[in-house]
Amino acid sequence: MLHTQVPEEEGVELRRTADGKGDGVLATRSFAAGETVLVGFLVGPLTGNDSHATQMGPGRWARHGGLGPKVNHSCDPNCGVRLNDGQAFDIVARQPIGAGQELTFDYAMRNFTIDHFPAVCLCGAARCRGSVTGWKDLPATRKANYGELVAPYLRTMDDEIRRALTEGGR
């Protein structure tokens, strides 16, 4: 059994998931809604997008260190992301999380488009979209439900697209 604990990431550990889908980050203690579960940090910029890249803005990607990249996707996640002072994304609880629960976030919370995942989503959530998609493909209700726990540039891009459509329709 894979079992890794990083001192800076107390309260979580990397393990095999109970559903047999592979590795996941699980809580080893309870977290309250709004609590930072993992503090994000960057290990370097990237020249393009890949399956472990984090989109930092239009045409910009970086690689996160620690256990953050090991947090799995869910179409109905218990976590979201918040940009920190180091320009990395913290993983933040969207709801109470109990010890033993797997941490998940929607990869669309920090990627406008996603082109590097399998066509079929394996999250198993009741609200599963069927595929891992980017922010641009989310319905407005889902975007609103995520509140502020998404990459800020995504909201800016939505505003720019709306503005362009409004100006183009005049």
What are the language-model segments listed below?
Residues 1-170:
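Conserved catalytic SET/PR domain of SAM-dependent protein methyltransferases, capturing the structural core
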